[in-house]
């Protein structure tokens, strides 16, 4: 019976053809049922209810503050289940304002952080695979070109050891936007981890989005975030 499940896994992902170690000690029934390969291991990858195949919605700028009996919106709206979230209020940027100038309004920016941790063994992967074979781990994300600031998006992905703290490999991305010409679209971010050394057991995925409040609230959205483990690795050259 165990052999049948092992054969099913081999047939499903061509593990033997890719040179994946397949020890008999692995619970192949569990591997087949959890399906750890070629699927998104992140929970709730589109918390704003949008996807990158449709242009991001244009913001409605009325310029009218909320009624005095209603508190202003300071946090984004969405379903953030599966994500740990945090908001960091940034100081007002007064650079470039001459001394003595009377300021009526300044935009206030905030970083909104979403993060989650993927347990690779709970997802169905096994020690020999992660330590000896080291399959490719593909990261993808799409963020909205909101034009709220030159820095509106940050990505930080860490491959962690069994203690959930030791960083074995890390990828960060901190782009700067061109605000000279108006553009409002989705921007793709991607990275492939390979040859990352033995010991990886968790993936910590974090991205930060910059929001703005000035009379009204405007945010930067993100969508279709993914962490996918491939049943393959780069060929040796």
From Swiss-Prot:
Keywords: Cytoplasm
GO biological processes: ERAD pathway; glycoprotein catabolic process; SCF-dependent proteasomal ubiquitin-dependent protein catabolic process
Composition bias type Pro residues, residue spans: 64-74
Record carries keyword Cytoplasm: yes
Chief place of localization: cytoplasm
Entries under SMART domains matching the protein: FBA
Any Gene Ontology CC annotation: cytoplasm
InterPro entries xrefs: F-box-assoc_dom, F-box_only, Galactose-bd-like_sf
Tissue: Expressed in nonspecific cytotoxic cells (NCC).
Region (Disordered) location: 40-82
Segments forming domain FBA: 31-231
Compartments, as annotated in UniProt: Cytoplasm
Function field: May promote cell proliferation.
Protein name, UniProt field: F-box only protein 50
Species this chain originates from: Danio rerio (Zebrafish)
Name of the gene this protein is made from: nccrp1
């Amino acid at each position: 019976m165990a052999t049948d499940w092992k054969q099913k896994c081999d047939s499903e992902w061509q593990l033997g053809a890719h040179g994946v170690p397949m020890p008999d000690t692995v619970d192949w029934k569990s591997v087949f049922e959890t399906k750890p390969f070629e699927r998104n291991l992140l929970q709730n990858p589109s918390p704003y209810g949008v996807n990158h195949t449709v242009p991001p919605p244009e913001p409605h700028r009325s310029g009218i503050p909320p009624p005095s009996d209603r508190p202003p919106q300071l946090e984004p709206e969405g379903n953030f289940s599966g994500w740990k979230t945090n908001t960091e209020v940034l100081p007002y940027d007064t650079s470039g304002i001459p001394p003595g100038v009377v300021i009526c309004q300044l935009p206030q920016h905030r970083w909104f952080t979403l993060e989650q941790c993927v347990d690779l063994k709970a997802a169905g992967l096994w020690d020999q695979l992660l330590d000896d074979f080291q399959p490719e781990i593909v990261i993808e994300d799409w963020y909205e070109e909101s034009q709220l600031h030159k820095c509106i998006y940050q990505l930080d992905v860490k491959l962690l050891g069994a203690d959930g703290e030791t960083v074995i490999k890390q990828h960060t991305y901190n782009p700067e936007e061109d605000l000279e010409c108006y553009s409002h679209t989705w921007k793709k971010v991607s990275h492939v981890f390979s040859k990352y050394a033995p010991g990886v057991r968790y993936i910590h995925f974090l991205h930060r989005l910059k929001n703005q409040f000035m009379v009204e609230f405007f945010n930067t959205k993100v969508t279709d975030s993914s962490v996918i483990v491939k049943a393959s690795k780069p060929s040796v050259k």
